[in-house]
Amino acid sequence: MHTYVTQELPAVINANFSFDERQGLMGHSMGGHGALLIGLTQAVPFKTIAALSPITNTLVNEWTIDAFTRYLGPDKEVWKQYDSTELVKSGVGKHVSIRVDYGSLDEYSDLLKCDEFEAVCKANGYENISFHCHEGFDHGYFFISSVIEEVLKDQYQRLTRE
């Protein structure tokens, strides 16, 4: 999926549409996790990242521990390259503009760990990351449909800033 998002899809888009270098990436939940990983570790092609209710700390997430053990083996040091919180602790990705949105009533907040991720970002001097907790929203479709316009407008503004 990483190669598809960072190489194959941009190549198809650039071959068929008129685009410049101002490109952003957005994802929700596990897709938000992927968007954060790509944003933190890739200098190009994405200048902005929007992560909606992202999984931010895979090392302590019961959803990912079993999968990581099966796919990557038991060594948690190997897993760190796939954990946004660990990447921020190592100082990578300060160049990209990132926005994180999540609902205050997200039933998976204990797994997403957005609050902890925000604290780690602040402690490590990440100035290009903003966090937006939306009161009364959970993890689902209504949350996404309610915030998507605001998030897209923000992505556009961040992409067109010089």
List PLM regions with ranges:
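Non-catalytic cap/lid and distal C-terminal segments of serine-dependent acyl enzymes
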Residues: 1-162
